[in-house]
Design a protein with these regions (language model features):
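Phosphate-group recognition and catalysis centered on beta-loop-alpha active-site segments
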Residues: 1-238
């Protein structure tokens, strides 16, 4: 339902999917490695089978935390699999997918690429037009994907405070496999944004929820932002 709202109502540019994997090997969309925060369950996603995960209520927490945006229909929402999302929105939607470190879920990258291929999202036309972007904080995960398919656009996520530690050698090494950089928005200045663009990166900061920050970052020249308020950002870029 969150994906329906962002895709159908708010017309967000991309459907963002954070991937975890169940005990029986299914890729599912969930931000955290545990189910504690966003369901009525406890423990790690990898300790649940898909059937067990589907028993959990993944919607009521949102109604409680964000009463202003609450909907009765969110109650008992189910955790979707990657395949269910790709099936629902089809090959013409845009997907921005985050992988974890390979040591958390070994083989996740191969699985993800197999799913994207099955849903006709890996043909060169789709990739050239940016229908799929894959991001990760893990260099190794991105490198694994790049080794398997060098046409998939990759974005290196950067922890808060880390960007300032990157010298040009490090940035160029990242640029050898990733087309984009995803820093915490508070780490961007006009100067370092221009420098990243000069090195050939697209720049997609996270998570920008205030209009003033959106305006400032657009002035710096970012290529887009991650936000919880796609409608607000659409007003800014009109």
């Amino acid at each position: 339902q969150a994906y329906d709202k962002s895709h159908n109502e708010l017309k967000a540019s991309y459907i963002e999917i954070d991937l975890q994997r169940t005990k029986d090997g299914h890729l599912v969309a969930m931000h955290d490695e545990t189910v504690n925060r966003t369901t009525n369950g406890h423990g790690k996603v990898e300790d649940y089978t898909l059937d067990e995960l589907k028993q959990l209520d993944a919607g009521s927490w949102f109604n409680k935390k964000y009463p202003k945006y609450a909907r009765a229909s969110y109650k008992n929402a189910k955790v979707p699999t990657l395949d269910e999302i790709l099936e629902r929105y089809g090959p013409n939607a845009n997907y921005y997918i985050e992988t974890k470190s390979p040591d958390v879920y070994p083989g996740m990258e191969e699985q993800l690429l197999a799913s994207l291929k099955k849903h006709h999202l890996l043909n060169n036309n789709k990739l050239k037009n940016g229908h799929v972007m894959i991001q990760s904080f893990s260099d190794e995960s991105l490198k694994k994907i790049h080794r398997q398919n060098k046409h998939v656009p990759l974005v290196k996520l950067v922890d808060k405070g880390e960007l300032q530690q990157f010298n040009d050698q490090r940035l160029k090494e990242i640029r050898s496999y990733a087309i984009g950089l995803g820093p915490d928005y508070t780490d961007l200045t006009e100067q370092n944004t221009h420098h990243l663009k000069d090195l050939g990166f697209i720049v997609h900061p996270y998570t920008v929820n205030e209009k003033a920050d959106m305006l400032r970052l657009n002035k710096y020249g970012v290529d887009g932002v991650f936000t919880n308020f796609a409608d607000k950002y659409k007003e800014v870029i009109k």
